[in-house]
Structure formats: C-alpha cells, structure tokens
Amino acid sequence: IPGAFYIKNFMQVEFYLKSLTLEDIPNHGTIHFICNSWIYNSKVYKSDRIFFANNTYLPSETPAPLLKYREEELKNVRGDGSGERKEWDRVYDYDVYNDLGNPDKGAALARPVLGGSTLPYPRRGRTGRPKTKKDPNSEKPSDFVYLPRDEAFGHLKSSDFLAYGLKSVSQDVLPVLTDAFDGNLLSLEFDNFAEVHKLYEGGVTLPTNFLSKYAPIPIVKEIFRSDGEQFLKYPPPKVMQVNKSAWMTDEEFARETIAGVNPNVIKSLEEFPPRSKLDTQSFGDHTSIITKEHLEINLGGLTVEQAIQSKKLFILDHHDYLIPYLRRINASATKTYATRTIFFLKSDGTLAPLAIELSKPHPQGDEHGPVSEVYVPAYEGVEAYIWLLAKAYVVVNDSCYHQLVSHWLNTHAVVEPFVLATNRQLSVVHPVYKLLFPHYRDTMNINSLARKSLVNADGIIEKTFLWGRYALELSAVIYKDWSLHDQALPNDLVKRGVAVKDPSAPHGVKLVIEDYPYASDGLEIWDAIKSWVVEYVAFYYKSDEVLQQDSELQAWWKELVQVGHGDLKDKPWWPKMQSRENLVEVSTTLIWIASALHAAVNFGQYPYGGLILNRPTISRRFMPEKGSAEYAALAKNPEKEFLKTITGKKETLIDLTVIEILSRHASDEIYLGERDGGDHWTSDAGPLEAFKRFGKKLAEIEKKLVQKNNDETLRNRTGPAKMPYTLLYPSSEEGLTFRGI
C-alpha cells in the first residue's frame, strides 16, 4: 500500500499541489495525500519532491520502508546553513534580527542586531542575504525577502490583501500623503474633535488634478472604497458608533484595561506606594509619589491598606521599562512620560481611575531620580482637560507596549522559532507536527512582511509610534523577562494578581475582578484547547516513556530551547519535555498564543484604535503648566490643544490605514476548530472525533459569550461605548468584524 509518492514538474512554471487521492486501492479503499505545496521545475531541486499519505506515526512506529524517506525529507528541509536562499527553496534555518536597519544609507538608519547579544531576541528564518558594507553584522535589505516557499501566502485570495496592503501603504499611500501635506493640500493639524469624526463621514479628500498625477492605487479602491476626490475613507470604529464621546469617560478608559485591545497588562496593586526595580545607583529613587490622600477621597470610606487587603486596587504600570529610554525618546520630536495609573474596583464591578503619575527624567541627570507629578480626576473647566491629557499620556504608553510587546513580540516573534523547529525536526507524519502545524499558517510570512515595512528602520511603526527608532530595541529589553510558562493564560492571570489559584474553581483559578471579559472568556477558550490537546496527546503517547524515547520530539524541543529561543536557554522555567503533561502544557500554550491571544490583541486594533482620540500612539508636547501660555491656550481652545499634543494628522492617517488592514479577516481564513482539507488531515479516527468535539465545544462557548454580553449586570462587557466584548467569539465572517479566533 503506497505510503508516499515522488513528483517531478517538467514545466517551466510552478504549480500548487493541494492534494492527491488514490481510490479503489485493493483491500484498502481510498488513500489521501494532503500536499499544500508549490512544485517548481525539477531542475531547481537537489532531491525529488516527496509527499506522504495522511497516516500518523511516531518515529519508532514508522513502517520500515518509509523510515529512510522520513529522515531524508527532514534533512532536505534543514538545509546546510549556507548560501543565499532562492524563491523555490524550502529550507528552514535560524538567524538573528539583523535586517531591520540599512546602515549603508547612513547612521540614522542603522539599528542594533537583536538576538545573540546584549539585546536578546527570538530567532527568525534565515535568508542568507549579503551583509551591508558599513556593518558586517547586518544583512542588506532587499526587495525579495526569502521565505520557505510554502510559507508564502499560498492559499488563494488569502491574506494576500495583507501582504499587498502593507506593501501598498508604504509604496503608494505614504508618498501621496507626504506630497499632499508638503503642498499644503491638507492642513497639518486637526482643529477639533468634529474634524476627526469627519474622517469616517467624508474621508480624506484631495483634488482630482492632484490625484491624477499618481497611478491608480488599487488598494485605495478595494479597502477604502473611495472614488473621485475621496482618497481615503475610513469606516466608523466601533468605539464611536453609538456614542462619539464615550472614550472621554473614566469608565471606558478603565474598562479598556480589561476588555480593550491590550487587556493583559493591568496588575493587582500589592504594595503602597508602588516601588521600582530600577537600579538606584544609575537611576535614583523611583518610588511613586502617589500618596494615600490622592486615593482615599475616592475609596468609599476604605483606607489604602484595607483596599489592598481586599484586592480592590490595581495598577497599569508603564514606568520601569521606559525610564532608561525616556531621555533619548524625548530628545526627538516626541515628548512623553513614564506612567503609573491606579484603579479602584467599585462595588458595581467596574474599575475607576484614581490617580495618574507622570514621570520624566531629571534635568540634572538620571541619578537624581525622576521629576514626577500626580493627577487626580477632575471634570470641570480646564482641569477636566488636564485630566483628559493625563489619561492620553497613559494610553500612548499602552498603545506602544500593545503594538510592540503584546502584539508583535508575544504573538508573532516568539512563535517563529516554533515554526522553524517544527519543520526542521518533526516529520509531517509526526503527530505533534499535525497538532501544531495549522497554527503556524502565515506566521513567517507576516513576520517577514513586518520586518520589511512595519518594524524596520524608519518604517511605519517607527514613524507612527512614540518609541520611534527604539521600538524594537525596547521590545528586546522586555523579552529578557519573557517566559513561555507565563504565556499560559491561568499562569499569566495569577502572576499579575488578577486571579488566585483555586482548585475548586471551574478553570483552577478564581478571578479577582469577576467581570473581566478578556480573562473570563479566555479561560473558557483555554480550557477547550487544553481538553483537545490532552485527548490528542494521550492517543499517541500511552506513557511518559514513549514520549521520552521519541527521538524527533526530543530533538525538536532541544533545538527550540537552545537555538530558537537560545538567548534564554538557561532559564529555569523551561519544561524538560519528559512527560505527557509537559507536552500538553507547551502545546496548549503555543496554540493559545497563536490563536486566541493573537485574536484578543489584534482584531480590536481598528475597532478601538481607529478613533485616534481613544488610542493615540504619540505625544508631542509635555503637560501644560499652570500660568503658562499653553495652559491659557488649553483653557481657551481645549480640543485644539489636546489634538496638538497627541498623534499628528499625517501619522494618524498612516496608523489608521495600517490598523484597518491588520484588523480584517481574509475571505479564506481558517478559524480555531476548523482544518484546511476537512477530515483528511489525519487517517486516525480517534483524533478526528476529538477534534469534532473541540469544534462543538467552541460553538457552545460562543453561545455562552453571547449570553454574557446580553447580561446587563456585567457592566464591563459593553461599557459606555456600548460595544460588547466579542474578540474571543471563535467564529467570524470576513472583513472588519471585531471577532473570530
């Protein structure tokens, strides 16, 4: 009975082989081969292309005739680590992030290498491009960026709009906007909030004679549905669809820390005043200057000690990681503060901000500690806008941390080493390959696109986010403390003090904020993933010994830890991969990161951040001081002064264009609980049945989440903006839906 087949292409063009089905095999019926691969002319390959039937075998159980082919195919995919990779190659190998800068074009475009140095980083896929002249450690940027061929968007319509959209923003949209601003066709600043709202009503209009100088930009027609003089038209973001000023309320500001686009940073406040972990010799004393008096006026009769004891105080802390970079960031056109925000859990289950501390470096040197100021809620006169500005500085830090850490680092960059190790060490017939492979769809492609036009030197992120040229460097500083163990949702919640371990609770943890939409929905999804993984692992590994003797699995884990995440290889938290429990925990965590965690931090970007007033990405001026001309201007024209402080108009248009593309689902997206190729991904009935149960469970969870959103006693589910928290609904249509995993 055939277990594999070779294929040769004698044509000059490549073709995409989806699957092969052999019918009426004597004594066997039908055999399915799932291929999903581009086949080039056979001359470009060193060895013939082989595909295996959809049977699943541990290495020790592989039929003897197939063993040689199994090992050979893995060797082909690993390559030999040399040479520049070509379009048709299928080689997976590791490299450091040394292709973000372009030192040959000047020092302003040089960027440090991330990984293998004092700036640790997960590895990326190796391309083997030549090095730059100015820096022998940096790789030359190029138009063609190698990707193992089957990692490129191979599915048909596929997220192609993403690839093509991002490329078009930098190559087409940016130049038009730059010329329009330079030629005074667009005013440099928004004058008031109503002008921001106009973006969603009339869009950005430019004279036809100006637009006719440019070739038609297909993306503008397709994504921004514009015509005539309308250059860009944006759909109204969900956060303003019902109430245009909901974003200004304290309740919405607080709610977005637990149900917004960055819902996993807020922590329980365990000590008062909040302290810093920064070295006092280098940075002075960074203990917070927030006092009990600042808080107790709004604690409903409690003292700070009582509120901490009863777990009613929380902190959104954007202080320590930013301080060492703050002086450099503020030396550019941006001006900002490190922030600490204290929240109180009220009796109705909602959070209220009590105080915001803004800290900037001391003019006489870091060792003198920060210059800090504390702001408390105010709702009348100029002080109401001072408070609104204080919240805006907090959100700017939160936006940067969200984009560079919660989104890019924690759901994109850390996954790439798993993609590489899985392809290099686990055969396509290995059960763990089949379990994890669907969750890698497009990861390397999107990451490679990001390195080319989003997170590169002077790319879209550096242009539109406060951290500027330090954006990726700061994410490397934060990666030093990354741990796979903490990415598991229950561990993350306990570590942040927003849940406590409780064996009697449904998911083993009890939430401190009961109505915490991201956490309560997330635990349901986490549990469903874990149950599926437990069943799957038990089907193939009847004991821990079988797992310990699985040569491919052990090589996979060793390479992932020692090479893929090699800068952290000596950390004690890495599991040893000696038990089925280890494999379940690692696989569940990885699937969670690549599916639900990514959905929670990605698909809400436009619904929340599309209104720049709600999620500004840059601050350009410091807080006005009493008695200054800026303070008088704020009193006279508060909206204009607020807008002069946050993200500028040009940066806003670029930011909105990008996050609208990122927040969309493709028409052929595959959601959690679904598989490409239907039931043919494995020939084993047990896992197929378990997977169907997993799909059913997710559909049940979705019904439960819909009910929660209809429960008016759960105030954090919809908030003042009246936008139900739907980011962890498993299913979705295509487009901008604010849901879908």
From Swiss-Prot:
What chemistry does it catalyse, as a reaction equation? (9Z,12Z)-octadecadienoate + O2 = (9S)-hydroperoxy-(10E,12Z)-octadecadienoate; (9Z,12Z)-octadecadienoate + O2 = (13S)-hydroperoxy-(9Z,11E)-octadecadienoate; (9Z,12Z,15Z)-octadecatrienoate + O2 = (13S)-hydroperoxy-(9Z,11E,15Z)-octadecatrienoate
Q: Which residues form the PLAT domain?
A: 1-53
Q: Which GO terms describe its molecular function?
A: linoleate 13S-lipoxygenase activity; linoleate 9S-lipoxygenase activity; metal ion binding
Q: Where in the cell is it found?
A: Cytoplasm
Quick check: keyword Cytoplasm in the entry?
yes
**Among the record's GO biological process terms, what is one?**
lipid oxidation
Enumerate the UniProt keywords alphabetically.
Answer: Cytoplasm, Dioxygenase, Fatty acid biosynthesis, Fatty acid metabolism, Iron, Lipid biosynthesis, Lipid metabolism, Metal-binding, Oxidoreductase, Oxylipin biosynthesis
| Composition bias type Basic and acidic residues, residue spans | 133-144
Binding of Fe cation, residues: 407, 412, 598, 602
Cofactors: Fe cation
Q: What is its EC number?
A: 1.13.11.58, 1.13.11.12
Top enzyme class:
oxidoreductase
> Which parts of the sequence are annotated with region: Disordered?
108-144
Report domain Lipoxygenase positions: 56-741
- State the pathway, as annotated in the record: Lipid metabolism; oxylipin biosynthesis
Q: Where along the chain is composition biased (Basic residues)?
A: 123-132
Q: How is the cofactor bound?
A: Binds 1 Fe cation per subunit. Iron is tightly bound.
| Assembly description | Monomer.
What does this protein's UniProt record list under function?
Plant lipoxygenase may be involved in a number of diverse aspects of plant physiology including growth and development, pest resistance, and senescence or responses to wounding. It catalyzes the hydroperoxidation of lipids containing a cis,cis-1,4-pentadiene structure.
User: What's the protein here called?
Assistant: Linoleate 9S-lipoxygenase
